[in-house]
């Protein structure tokens, strides 16, 4: 009897273990290590976060360069972004340099106001540093592109439009961009918008909206849509956007922070101003950078 009971107990335990293993979600495969950079952890500033990794193609004529800015809501993320794993080989095949930038996050802002300024200042500082390395790294300054997703997309849109495209950026590729960080405009475009208050030091969206007029100069400085409206069309880069479709009329965005409406509204402003903007993928972005400048009308400065 005791042996029978023991066998039954073992069978029940084994069955429970098997069922729990079957019900458990499959573990995510760890991201593959990125290919070894040509230059790892290049320092472009005094803060520990101000570093970049650089992948250069084989020597030859000066090459285009893509500067990648990671996402993460300006709260997390780093330059070792897994999505680079599929982009690095494509860039090498097209003889395009790839530079991945790490930057200070909102938590590193200290007394800086608005907090998002430290993120934007680092991205623009990184671009200046890359430009200063053009001769050493064999880069063609007339063919510099910027790319990022989510918060990184916001950062590269800002960097490509600030100062009337002062860096001479030829093309920008974004995924899931926040093309406006004006709370009033965001609610008009996407009624259930809830992102962005912490960029300006507010605890929630409604408080930010209530105090909008107090921070309007900052909004005008850092919001891509506002910068786009003021940019000289002939100086603007070409834009390639990727991401989900916009919700149907009357429907709320399931993910308002990454709604396709951001992309659509930005494209409408571009169309009204005669600025190149299309829906596309990374390959289309690379093609814009590998064309002769005579075909795009974009010249480096």
Please identify what each model-predicted range represents.
Residues 34, 47, 183-230:
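Mobile cap/lid helix-loop segments that gate and shape the active-site cleft of serine hydrolases
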Residues 73-79, 98, 129:
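Serine-hydrolase catalytic-loop signature spanning alpha/beta hydrolases and amidase-signature enzymes
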Residues 62-73:
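Short beta-strand element of the alpha/beta-hydrolase
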Residues 114-135:
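Alpha/beta-hydrolase active-site loop
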Residues 128-190:
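Primarily recognizes the serine-hydrolase "nucleophile elbow" in alpha/beta-hydrolase
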Residues 27-60:
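N-terminal cap/lid segment of alpha/beta-hydrolase-fold proteins
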Residues 181, 210-283:
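Serine-hydrolase catalytic core
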Residues 80-99:
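Short amphipathic alpha-helix adjacent to the substrate-entry channel of hydrolases
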């Amino acid at each position: 009897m005791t042996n029978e009971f023991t066998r039954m107990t073992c069978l029940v335990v084994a069955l429970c273990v098997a069922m729990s293993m079957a019900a458990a979600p499959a573990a995510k495969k760890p991201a593959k290590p990125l290919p070894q950079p040509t230059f790892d952890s290049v320092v472009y500033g005094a803060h520990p976060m101000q570093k970049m990794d650089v992948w250069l193609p084989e020597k030859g004529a000066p090459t285009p360069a893509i500067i990648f800015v990671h996402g993460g809501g300006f709260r997390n993320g780093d330059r070792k972004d897994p999505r680079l794993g599929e982009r690095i080989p494509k860039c090498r095949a097209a003889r395009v340099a790839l530079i991945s930038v790490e930057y200070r996050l909102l938590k590193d802002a200290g007394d800086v106001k608005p907090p998002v300024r430290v993120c934007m200042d680092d991205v623009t500082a990184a671009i200046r540093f890359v430009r200063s390395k053009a001769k050493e790294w064999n880069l063609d300054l007339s063919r510099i592109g910027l790319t990022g997703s989510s918060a990184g997309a916001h950062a590269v849109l800002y960097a490509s439009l600030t100062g009337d495209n002062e860096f001479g950026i030829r093309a920008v590729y974004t995924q899931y961009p926040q093309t406006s960080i004006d709370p009033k405009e965001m609610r008009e475009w996407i009624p259930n918008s809830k992102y962005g208050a912490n960029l300006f030091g507010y605890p929630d969206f409604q408080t930010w909206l209530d105090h909008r007029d107090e921070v309007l100069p900052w909004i005008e400085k850092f919001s891509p849509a506002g910068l786009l409206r003021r940019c000289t069309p002939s100086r603007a880069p070409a834009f390639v956007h990727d991401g989900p479709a916009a919700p149907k009329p009357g429907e709320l965005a399931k993910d308002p922070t990454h709604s396709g409406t951001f992309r659509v509204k930005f494209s409408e402003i571009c169309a009204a101003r005669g600025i190149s903007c299309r829906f596309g993928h990374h390959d289309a972005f690379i093609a814009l950078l590998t064309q002769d400048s005579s075909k795009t009308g974009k010249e480096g400065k």
